[in-house]
Amino acid sequence: MSVSNDLIWQVIRDNNRFLVKRPEFGGIQFNREPVNVSGKNAQRFSGLCNDKAVGVQANSPRGVVLITKTNPKNAQKPAKLFRKDVIANASSRKTYKSIAGRIGRTGYRDDLVKVSVARASAILSSQRPKKTVA
């Protein structure tokens, strides 16, 4: 017996392990899930209630790691639940094209392509060496 994604979201939206509430900023809620590409606490981005979810994280020296959820049959096997693809030391445009290809053109989650590319862009710009004033 499976439970619908909408019902799961109704249960976890106000209380889960990854939720970060900021009452001093008007009650805004963020999310620290590894497969939440935007960091917003919204059903569209949540990896807990969607069968297909995308995450973009920094790779240690340079580059990004693209995390996607695999088949929902692996829900009881945490080691097989996520697929991690390392996109390392490529130019920015190649990285963006690779992310767009793996998420959008394959039909995985077309709605998360722009958000994923923006997240990768922010990560890559933070990894660039800082310019020094001579």
UniProtKB/Swiss-Prot annotation:
Localization annotation: Cytoplasm
InterPro entries: Ribosomal_eL28 (IPR002672), Ribosomal_eL28/Mak16 (IPR029004)
Record-linked Pfam families: Ribosomal_L28e (PF01778)
Phosphoprotein recorded as keyword: yes
GO BP terms, alphabetized: cytoplasmic translation
Alphabetized GO MF terms: structural constituent of ribosome
Keywords assigned by UniProt, alphabetized: Cytoplasm, Phosphoprotein, Ribonucleoprotein, Ribosomal protein
Residue positions where Phosphoserine is found in the record: S60
Gene3D superfamilies assigned: 3.30.390.110
Record's GO cellular component terms: cytosol; cytosolic large ribosomal subunit
Subunit structure and binding partners: Component of the large ribosomal subunit (LSU). Mature yeast ribosomes consist of a small (40S) and a large (60S) subunit. The 40S small subunit contains 1 molecule of ribosomal RNA (18S rRNA) and at least 33 different proteins. The large 60S subunit contains 3 rRNA molecules (25S, 5.8S and 5S rRNA) and at least 46 different proteins.
Free-text function comment from the UniProt entry: Component of the ribosome, a large ribonucleoprotein complex responsible for the synthesis of proteins in the cell. The small ribosomal subunit (SSU) binds messenger RNAs (mRNAs) and translates the encoded message by selecting cognate aminoacyl-transfer RNA (tRNA) molecules. The large subunit (LSU) contains the ribosomal catalytic site termed the peptidyl transferase center (PTC), which catalyzes the formation of peptide bonds, thereby polymerizing the amino acids delivered by tRNAs into a polypeptide chain.
Family: Belongs to the eukaryotic ribosomal protein eL28 family.
Protein name from the UniProt record: Large ribosomal subunit protein eL28
Organism the protein comes from: Schizosaccharomyces pombe (strain 972 / ATCC 24843)
Gene: rpl44
